Amino acid sequence: MFNTHKVEIEWGGRPLTLETGKIARQADGAVLATYGETAVLATVVSAKEPKPGQDFFPLTVNYQEKTYAAGKIPGGYFKREGRPSENETLVSRLIDRPIRPLFVDGYKNDTQVVITVLQHDLENNPDILSMVAASAALTISGVPFMGPISGARVGYIDGEYVLNPNIDEMPESKLDLVVAGTSEAVLMVESEAQELPEDVMLGAVMFGHKSFQPVIDAIIKLAEVAAKEPRDFQPEDLSELEAKVLAVVENDLREAYKITEKQARYAAVDAAKAKAKEHFFPEGVEETEMSAEQFATIFKHLQAKIVRWNILDTGNRIDGRDLSTVRPIVSEVGILPRTHGSALFTRGETQAIVVATLGTGEDEQMIDALTGTYKESFMLHYNFPPYSVGETGRMGSPGRREIGHGKLAWRAIHPMLPAAEQFPYTIRAVSEITESNGSSSMATVCGTSLALMDAGVPIVRPVAGIAMGLIKEGERFAVLSDILGDEDHLGDMDFKVAGTEFGITSLQMDIKIDGITEEIMKVALEQAKGGRVHILGEMAKAISSSRAELGEFAPRIEVMNIPTDKIRDVIGSGGKVIREIVEKTGAKINIEDDGTVKIASSNGKEIEAAKKWIHSIVAEPEVGEIYEGTVVKTADFGAFVNFFGPRDGLVHISQLAADRVAKTTDVVKEGQKVWVKLMGFDERGKVRLSMKVVDQETGKEIVAEKKKEEVDAE
């Protein structure tokens, strides 16, 4: 019934298995991949024909984690998986980026890649395995995919590169880098690092590329026995038509791309396109030498050619800069004084307002992952409204691009945040992109760094980011610093680097062509370093280090530690005690399992009141000390006084006053405030108090009678 094929190799000290022919046989390609005991199923389906009028390649990658893979049942009312989590979205993008450039130019059939995590061993992260499985499924599907690709995760532990470190090893690593590519070239890099130098980062990329070669060989081996017949797809030869269109539009496009202002340049390009359309599609003529779709493809191609020719021939870019110049920068902080921290970062025609907000442990984000539930105390959200590029568009929940850009900026900032013990706040940064002409994610990095410093968050060092580009024709190439949006779309590489003056904290690279050598990447990293240091200098004109004090409207958090056996006393039955403390003091209180107590309020008096209350619950009274208390009950033999948090003690009738007392209520009444001295504990551990050795007016001990009365009490 099944015609199965399997390939197994040893990779990074664990078995990697690729199997096809048994599951999802109606898909164009399906591969069950297992690494260690983590298993994923990747499927590929591509439509037989493109939709009429389709002028782009509609590729969708869906990565989905099933909770049963880790032996869990989903939370919530419906008890089933819902909308994609942030991690699922990020992994979908991680897989999409290296495979998208490898589909044959001109292929426009609707294509969907679905990767499902079926089993998670809680050791091997399924993201790299999912990339490998997707590549294998595409390679055997018959779809015009010029792969295969593979990916690898690279760690850096004790000065050594580590291939595919497991989940337990990652906290020790100074690097979390994912690299993907073909056997010849690197196509994609994504990383977070602890201020590592450029040569270490480049070494990690090359180490990863070398390490995944056995996987590519395994995919080829599987394809040799299991691949379907390649689809009969031949890309159109548009060279003759392109030459005709070029003759009409070249001069107009060259002039348009001399205009430095974005909107005016776009208007000139649109005018050139309209003029060419009139030439090739005259009114009233039904039969033309090319279709509208062919014209759109050719015009887009010519736009790229003219920009690229100009850069390589003259060294001048669209906006008149040379290859390494960064656009003018203006940095401002404190622009929204009622917020906890704020910044406006403007670089050329790219601008971001970033606002930092500080919260307590109650504000931490609860994340339910396959590996377990954990809390995240730093959030960075990136918003890209359509007005930022002068357009109308959909508003609402964030899209994949916004989630991806936010995470890239998060990775850049995260290594420079203070430890929770030093700064016990939850931090949320929100970047509102108000203008965009290239590299808005790196503007978010710069703006977030400024806003956090304005908020008084003691980051280790300021962080800046820069986007690099590449134009390559044959042996000639040009590396561009601080690319515009057009240079991103029309170039061969988008290379974002963020870090401090001492090293890189985040790196993201997407390469659209083969042949990017180690030498080119080295040039790009060095050029990026110069740009990054320049940007840090411009940012320092606004603020160079974190403010010494938090903003006026930010909450204050103080931390105290209590014995773990006292946690129950502070919380009380059903939370009664802690609710009372919160209600009466106004402070927010968070108690952790290790006895760490965080008390938060914007009012210092509320914090002190809560601290004093908690201290009174957990502290032990000391023999010989004097306390103020309240009479809670009277009896024939004395009075019970609440004197130390919830603790009560007995003042025997003989200890109420220096003179003989006939009746307890002659001296004290319930609710009366009194001063008492802790004399000790009886054989049953009961508290013994005395009022007569304390001056009830001043609360001071009556020294003259101290020795005699203490003897009497004993």
From Swiss-Prot:
Record-linked SMART domains: KH, S1
Keywords for the protein's UniProt record, in alphabetical order: Cytoplasm, Magnesium, Metal-binding, Nucleotidyltransferase, RNA-binding, Transferase
Domain KH as annotated: residue spans: 555-614
Residue ranges of every copy of the S1 motif domain listed in the record: 624-692
NCBIfam families: polynuc_phos, PRK11824.1
Pfam families: KH_1, PNPase, RNase_PH, RNase_PH_C, S1
PANTHER family linked to this entry: POLYRIBONUCLEOTIDE NUCLEOTIDYLTRANSFERASE, POLYRIBONUCLEOTIDE NUCLEOTIDYLTRANSFERASE 1, MITOCHONDRIAL
EC number: 2.7.7.8
Binding residue positions for Mg(2+): D488, D494
Superkingdom per UniProt: Bacteria
Signal peptide boundaries: none
Protein species of origin: Brucella canis (strain ATCC 23365 / NCTC 10854 / RM-666)
Compartments, record wording: Cytoplasm
GO MF annotations, alphabetized: 3'-5'-RNA exonuclease activity; magnesium ion binding; polyribonucleotide nucleotidyltransferase activity; RNA binding
Record-level GO cellular component terms: cytosol
Family: Belongs to the polyribonucleotide nucleotidyltransferase family.
Protein name: Polyribonucleotide nucleotidyltransferase
KW RNA-binding (keyword) present: yes
